[in-house]
């Protein structure tokens, strides 16, 4: 049985008869792809994008680009895609970088510039500090105007100067104590190092303490053993 069908309306030379045999189906070759130049990418694409037979564009395999020569922190507002097709069509990245990358340490607290006072300003501040340690608001404004400073600068300077003055006083008070050492005040009896602490505290004026080794004991008047220091 022959299953070949031919159309009577068209000549045999213009159209190949359709066959449903397995051999004819396996030997059938697909139609070649049509190339259509895109309109909106005509200026940027170097080559044409091939289209499938049903009209959808055939996208070639994306190729990974090498890293940009410039650091991503210094890039402009334009965005460089990570992938480009072989025809030059950009493909957006899955995880794009933020538009404005933060610099390391951006949120660190910036240190304020240190105020530099002139010699005349320092002299005026020191003279006022010797007279008065604390200033009221009107006094600060008056002094700041006289020295061509701001009220905040005068207030900050007086705070730092008071802290410095307190440290100097504390240091001057600690130096005599370090020079004297652990000696007792003049006029008070000093007990030997081996005497107990309670004996040292309860000594009368002018008393002298004798200390003996711990293995030696004395016999009292009533025949009892007694140890420890004896006060003469």
UniProtKB/Swiss-Prot annotation:
Tissues and organs where the protein is expressed, per its UniProt entry: Expressed in brain. In brain, it is restricted to a few specific developing brain structures such as pineal gland, telencephalic septum, hypothalamic pre-mammillary body and arcuate nucleus.
Keyword tags: Activator, Cytoplasm, DNA-binding, Homeobox, Nucleus, Transcription, Transcription regulation
Reported function: DNA binding protein that function as transcriptional activator. Is essential for normal postnatal growth and nursing. Is an essential factor for neuronal neuropeptide Y and agouti-related peptide function and locomotory behavior in the control of energy balance.
GO molecular function: DNA-binding transcription activator activity, RNA polymerase II-specific; DNA-binding transcription factor activity; DNA-binding transcription factor activity, RNA polymerase II-specific; RNA polymerase II cis-regulatory region sequence-specific DNA binding; sequence-specific DNA binding; sequence-specific double-stranded DNA binding
DNA-binding region: 108-168
CDD domains: homeodomain
Region (Disordered): 160-232
Protein name listed in UniProt: Brain-specific homeobox protein homolog
InterPro entries per record: HD, HD_metazoa, Homeobox_CS, Homeobox_TF, Homeodomain-like_sf
Bias (Acidic residues) ranges: 212-224
Amino acid composition bias (Basic and acidic residues), ranges on this chain: 171-180
One Pfam entry name: Homeodomain
PANTHER family per the UniProt record, alphabetical: BRAIN-SPECIFIC HOMEOBOX, HOMEO BOX HB9 LIKE A-RELATED
UniProt biased composition (Basic residues): 161-170
Coiled coil: none
Family note: Belongs to the distal-less homeobox family.
GO CC terms in record: cytoplasm; nucleus; transcription regulator complex
UniProt-listed GO biological process terms: brain development; eating behavior; locomotory behavior; mammary gland involution; positive regulation of transcription by RNA polymerase II
